[in-house]
Amino acid sequence: MSRIGKLPIHVPAGVTVTIKDNVVTVKGPKGELVQEVNPDINVTLEDGVIHLTRPTDDKNHRALHGLYRSLINNMVVGCSEGYKKELELVGVGYRVSNTGQLLDLSLGYTHNIYLQLPKEVKVETKSERNKNPLIILESADKQLLGQICAKIRSFRMPEPYKGKGIKFVGEEIRRKSGKSAGK
């Protein structure tokens, strides 16, 4: 058995799960998510617990078993508690502001970068004096949230010499020493 796939998924109170024709729908206080499951993987819901089974111990089936268990678990957690990520802008003159779902980033380029966020992602920006600006993103969809964070981070990746760029809060950037002075 797959170490991850064999684990049951407990559905918390306030979250409803429906399974119909290999499509799993999870509704909760934070939103609604839908995931299509491979027809080879069998998904059952009994007494508030989701179980996944596979037909054979074939390598492909073992991989899919763990994959879909993790995806459905992420959906249940996302719809009940939600996911939150914080990005920090490190650098002189780096600024961020938002107007609704439009993010305005000033990252030292000759132009500002505007990013339209999907409606499933809630965004909040914090800019305090003498502190690095923060972007706080919340969503029920873990995959979408990670993709948006990676896109924002790609505009100015943290560099190893001064540590300037967009990084996750609490992330350690591996630093390098600069050029050694000549004799």
UniProtKB/Swiss-Prot annotation:
This protein binds to the 23S rRNA, and is important in its secondary structure. It is located near the subunit interface in the base of the L7/L12 stalk, and near the tRNA binding site of the peptidyltransferase center. Belongs to the universal ribosomal protein uL6 family. This is Large ribosomal subunit protein uL6. InterPro entries: Ribosomal_uL6-like, Ribosomal_uL6-like_a/b-dom_sf, Ribosomal_uL6_a/b-dom, Ribosomal_uL6_bac-type, Ribosomal_uL6_CS. Signal peptide: none annotated. HAMAP family: Ribosomal_uL6_B. It comes from the Bacteria. The lineage of its organism: Bacteria, Pseudomonadati, Bacteroidota, Bacteroidia, Bacteroidales. Part of the 50S ribosomal subunit. Keywords: Ribonucleoprotein, Ribosomal protein, RNA-binding, rRNA-binding. GO terms for biological process: cytoplasmic translation. GO terms for molecular function: rRNA binding; structural constituent of ribosome. GO terms for cellular component: cytosolic large ribosomal subunit.
